[in-house]
Amino acid sequence: MVKLSKEAKQRLQQLFKGSQFAIRWGFIPLVIYLGFKRGADPGMPEPTVLSLLWG
């Protein structure tokens, strides 16, 4: 096993916490963005922010 200094362990913990935060709070907005960027399937109405909010 690799020996890490206390400072290196703290930096890795911060990196993992930051990654967790980004994945948790960034996944849904990313999916929504990609959906709007791609557009609707042929024959389906265009997505709008209101249709997203009201279902």
UniProtKB/Swiss-Prot annotation:
Membrane side Mitochondrial intermembrane: residue ranges: 37-55
Biological process terms in GO annotation: positive regulation of protein targeting to mitochondrion; positive regulation of type 2 mitophagy; protein import into mitochondrial matrix; protein insertion into mitochondrial outer membrane; regulation of protein stability
Membrane topology field: Single-pass membrane protein
Transmembrane intervals: 21-36
Keywords noted in UniProt: Disease variant, Membrane, Mitochondrion, Mitochondrion outer membrane, Protein transport, Transmembrane, Transmembrane helix, Transport
UniProt entry tagged with the keyword Transmembrane helix: yes
GO molecular-function terms, A-Z: protein transmembrane transporter activity
Top-level taxon of origin: Eukaryota
Cytoplasmic side: 1-20
Subcellular location as annotated: Mitochondrion outer membrane
Gene Ontology annotations for the cellular component aspect, listed alphabetically: mitochondrial outer membrane; mitochondrial outer membrane translocase complex; mitochondrion; TOM complex
InterPro entries per record: Tom7
Main subcellular location of this protein, as a coarse class: mitochondrion
Entry similarity comment: Belongs to the Tom7 family.
Protein's job: Required for assembly and stability of the TOM complex. Positive regulator of PRKN translocation to damaged mitochondria. Acts probably by stabilizing PINK1 on the outer membrane of depolarized mitochondria.
Complex formation: Forms part of the preprotein translocase complex of the outer mitochondrial membrane (TOM complex) which consists of at least 7 different proteins (TOMM5, TOMM6, TOMM7, TOMM20, TOMM22, TOMM40 and TOMM70).
Disease: Garg-Mishra progeroid syndrome: An autosomal recessive syndrome characterized by a progeroid appearance, severe dwarfism, mandibular hypoplasia, hyperopia, and partial lipodystrophy.
PANTHER family: MITOCHONDRIAL IMPORT RECEPTOR SUBUNIT TOM7 HOMOLOG
The protein's name in its UniProt record: Mitochondrial import receptor subunit TOM7 homolog
Annotated organism of origin: Homo sapiens
